Design a protein with these regions (language model features):
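WD40-repeat beta-propeller superdomains and closely related acidic/aromatic-rich repeat-like regions
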Residues: 1-205
């Protein structure tokens, strides 16, 4: 993992998710770690946010031609949710992306995520520890430009409810960063006050 600007995490590779529509978070029932549900034109997938491991996959979810509160397609139900897979099959996951919804933009320990578009239609994602715009100090001190969607449409950006995972999803890929949870062994990232404390974990297919 290369790091720039006092530890800013920089993704080291790109693995596409063709036709990504949206993402949502859930908690693993066994140890409470963050999981991410990915919805695309090629089906639904559930991934570990730390390792990038694909935990479960549904390549052909029910298309739900009629509105159904228990439907499989997020835009077909009022709360933009879809059924969970694998270990969270008994739950529904709210999805943020092309059809609406949103992820958390702040964490309890003071991180803020913002999306700005100075070169519209391209979006930029900013991570800060100073409460957000207007930023206090120069770039690289208390705020960082961590992502530029100049190659694909931004679908969603934000934190998991736990605050342990940061995700940026576009129409072609997803990038995850992870905090160190005290009770979960992680491969990178520790709590702290600079992006060095967010390890860029994976870009999922």
């Amino acid at each position: 993992l290369r790091r720039l600007h006092r530890g800013e995490p920089v993704p080291t590779g790109l693995i596409p998710i063709g036709g990504l529509l949206g993402i949502g978070f859930a908690l693993a029932p066994d140890d409470g770690r963050d999981l991410v549900m990915v919805v695309s034109v090629n089906g639904h997938g559930l991934f570990d946010t730390v390792t990038g491991e694909k935990i479960a996959r549904d390549r052909d979810p029910d298309p739900d031609p009629d509105p159904d509160p228990d439907g499989s397609i997020p835009d077909a139900v009022p709360d933009l949710s879809c059924p969970g897979l694998g270990p969270i099959a008994s739950a529904r996951v709210r999805i943020a992306g092309l059809f609406g919804g949103g992820l958390h933009t702040t964490t309890e320990d003071g991180w803020t995520l913002e999306v700005v578009s100075p070169e519209w239609p391209h979006d930029r994602v900013l991570l800060s520890a100073d409460g957000g715009i207007p930023h206090n100090g120069p770039h690289g001190e208390n705020w960082w430009h961590i992502f530029d969607s100049n190659y694909s449409e931004l679908r969603a950006a934000g934190f998991s409810p736990s605050g342990h995972t940061l995700a940026v999803a576009t129409s072609s890929d997803e990038t995850l960063w992870s905090h160190q949870a005290p009770d979960i062994k992680r491969s990178a990232g520790q709590f702290g006050r600079s992006p060095a404390d967010w390890g860029a974990q994976s870009q999922l297919v």
